[in-house]
C-alpha cells in the first residue's frame, strides 16, 4: 500500500482516517463493511477472498479467481461450507446479446449445436502501444497472460451460452515481446506470460470449439465474436465490432441452400438487459436470477486454464 496515495484519496473523498486501511484483513473485518468487492491483481484474489469467507461476508471476485486450480478448489470448498454468498466477474454474461443467444439455443432455435468459434481481441500489447511491465505481464502476479485475462472470459462465455461442459482441451500459447520497460523507467524486465493463446476444446454433446485470444490485434479495443453453428441455423454474437462498441446478435435460419443464407441483426428484447453490480446486490439480497457466475464457475474455469497451459507445454490434448 502506498500510504501517501491512501491519504490523498482519503482526503479527496472525505473518508475518515479510521477507515483508511493498509491491511486488507482490517478492511474485510470492519464492522461497517457488508460485502467485499475484490478487484486486485490476481495474486491477491485468493487471500482476500478467503478473508471474506472467514468473516462470513458476501464477496464479488474478479477473474481468474486464483493463480492455480489447487487454490480455486480450496476457496470454492470453503465458500460452500460456510455458505457465503458470492459472485465471480465473468462480465460478458451480463451482455444482453449473450443472454439472448443463450435463450435462443435453449429454445432449440438453431437445433443441435455442432461448432462454436470464439475470438477475443485487444491491441494494447502491440509494441507501438508502449505498455510497460505492468502486473499483467508478470507470472507471479497474474498466473497467465492473455489466456487468463481474456481467455478466461471466452471460456466462460461459450460455456454459459451453450450450457455445456468442456471434456478436453488442447492449447498453444506464445509471447512476442519478451522484455518491457519497468514502471519506474529504470531499465527493462522480463515478460514471462503469453501474449496470445489459441486453443481448441470438445464439449458435451460432441460440440467442437475453437478459440483465438490475443492482445496483438491491431485496431481492436475490446473485440469479441462468437459464431455458433447448429443443425437448423446459426448465431453470431459480437462486441465492439462497430464504433458504438455495443453487443449485437445476428441469426441465420431457414432454407439450407447457401444462396438463402442471410444473417439478420435482431433487436434484443428488454428482458435480456441486466447490470453486473446490480446482480451482485441481488445475490446478496437473495433475489439473484441464477445467471451470474459463482465461485464454482470460477473453479471450473481455473481448471480449464491450468489444463490449457499444461497442454501447450506437452503439445497434446488433455481430458478434463
What are these regions (language model features)?
Residues 1-13:
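NAD(P)-binding Rossmann-fold cofactor-contacting core
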Residues 12, 35-38, 73, 81, ...:
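C-terminal helix-rich "cap/oligomerization" subdomain common to oxidoreductases
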Residues 13-78:
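Beta-loop-alpha module in the N-terminal Rossmann-like domain of NAD(P)-dependent dehydrogenases
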Residues 61, 86-88, 117, 211, ...:
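Hydrophobic residues in well-ordered beta-strands that form the structural core
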Residues 72-91, 111-115:
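Rossmann-fold dehydrogenase core element
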Residues 92-190, 315:
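Predominantly a Rossmann-like dinucleotide-binding segment in NAD(P)-dependent oxidoreductases
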Residues 156-245, 274-288:
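Contiguous beta-strand/loop segments that form the cofactor/metal-binding neighborhood of enzyme cores
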Amino acid at each position: 500500500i502506498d500510504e501517501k496515495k491512501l491519504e490523498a484519496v482519503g482526503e479527496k473523498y472525505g473518508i475518515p482516517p479510521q477507515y483508511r486501511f493498509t491491511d486488507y484483513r482490517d478492511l474485510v473485518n470492519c464492522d461497517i463493511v457488508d460485502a467485499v468487492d475484490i478487484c486486485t491483481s490476481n495474486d491477491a484474489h485468493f487471500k482476500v477472498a478467503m478473508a471474506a469467507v472467514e468473516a462470513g461476508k458476501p464477496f464479488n471476485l474478479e477473474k481468474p479467481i486464483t493463480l492455480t486450480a489447487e487454490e480455486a478448489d480450496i476457496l470454492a470448498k470453503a465458500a460452500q461450507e460456510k455458505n457465503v454468498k458470492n459472485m465471480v466477474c465473468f462480465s460478458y454474461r451480463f451482455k444482453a446479446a449473450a443472454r439472448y443467444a443463450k435463450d435462443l439455443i435453449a429454445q432449440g432455435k438453431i437445433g443441435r449445436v455442432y461448432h462454436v468459434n470464439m475470438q477475443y481481441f485487444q491491441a494494447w500489447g502491440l509494441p507501438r502501444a508502449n505498455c510497460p511491465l505492468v502486473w499483467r505481464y508478470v507470472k507471479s502476479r497474474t498466473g497467465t497472460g492473455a489466456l487468463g485475462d481474456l481467455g478466461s472470459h471466452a471460456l466462460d462465455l461459450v460455456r454459459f451460452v451453450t450450457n455445456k461442459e468442456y471434456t478436453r482441451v488442447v492449447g498453444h500459447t506464445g509471447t512476442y515481446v519478451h522484455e518491457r520497460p519497468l514502471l519506474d523507467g529504470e531499465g527493462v524486465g522480463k515478460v514471462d506470460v503469453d501474449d496470445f493463446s489459441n486453443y481448441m476444446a470438445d464439449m458435451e454433446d460432441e460440440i467442437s470449439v475453437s478459440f483465438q485470444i490475443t492482445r496483438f490485434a491491431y485496431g481492436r479495443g475490446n473485440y469479441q465474436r462468437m459464431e455458433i453453428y447448429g443443425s437448423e441455423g446459426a448465431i453470431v454474437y459480437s462486441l465492439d465490432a462497430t464504433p458504438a462498441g455495443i453487443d449485437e446478435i445476428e441469426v441465420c435460419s431457414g432454407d439450407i441452400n447457401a444462396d438463402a443464407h442471410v444473417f439478420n441483426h435482431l433487436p434484443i428484447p428488454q428482458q435480456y438487459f441486466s447490470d453486473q453490480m446490480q446482480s451482485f446486490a441481488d445475490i446478496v439480497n437473495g433475489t439473484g436470477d441464477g445467471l451470474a457466475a459463482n465461485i464454482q464457475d470460477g473453479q471450473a474455469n481455473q481448471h480449464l486454464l491450468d489444463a490449457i497451459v499444461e497442454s501447450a507445454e506437452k503439445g497434446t490434448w488433455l481430458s478434463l
